[in-house]
């Protein structure tokens, strides 16, 4: 079984979460990201696709892109657009699309368990994209994206999650 661990998240300020929330970086190109983030200085795309704040002809893998991501992340934190939790947590995430709810958790997983096969890959990622995201993590000193990991149904996990959701208010409703 894979190991998960809590962490101190850097999360959107609850008063502007709708302005910060953005689609994953890999479902749009730079031009689309520029259009989506236009007029919204709070969009997380300024961090995840920071090339939108640079010359449109810049090489996506230029060091300036990673430096801009870090600069934007630091500015978001300074302005409290993003705030860091005081204690480590495992976060419950519920998403409703087309009337169907999906519930999961957000936690840290082991890179070693991913490499040794304990956690199985569910998709092929092009090497240049892996290098890009590795650099992004290194420059930002933060993992700004999530990786979907599924597990075989375990009633005990469902019970823990459901009990928590039944007895606590959500941080965000969007």
Each model region followed by its residue ranges:
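A cross-family signal for N-terminal binding/gating loops and helix N-caps
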Residues: 1-174
């Amino acid at each position: 079984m894979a190991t998960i661990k809590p962490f101190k998240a850097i999360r959107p300020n609850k008063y502007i979460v709708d302005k910060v929330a953005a689609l994953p970086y890999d479902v749009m190109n730079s031009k689309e990201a520029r259009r989506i983030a236009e007029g919204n200085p709070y969009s997380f795309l300024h961090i995840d696709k920071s090339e939108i704040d640079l010359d449109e002809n810049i090489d996506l893998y230029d060091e300036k892109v990673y430096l801009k991501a870090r600069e934007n992340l630091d500015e978001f934190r300074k302005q409290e657009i993003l705030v860091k939790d005081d204690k480590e947590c495992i976060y419950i995430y519920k998403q409703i699309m087309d009337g169907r709810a999906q519930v999961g958790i957000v936690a840290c997983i082991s890179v070693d368990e991913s490499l040794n096969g304990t956690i199985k890959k569910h998709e092929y990622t092009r090497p240049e994209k892996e290098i890009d995201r590795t650099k992004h993590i290194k420059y930002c000193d933060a993992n700004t994206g999530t990786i979907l990991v599924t597990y075989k149904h375990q009633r005990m996990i469902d019970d823990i999650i459901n009990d928590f959701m039944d007895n606590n208010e959500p941080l965000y409703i969007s």
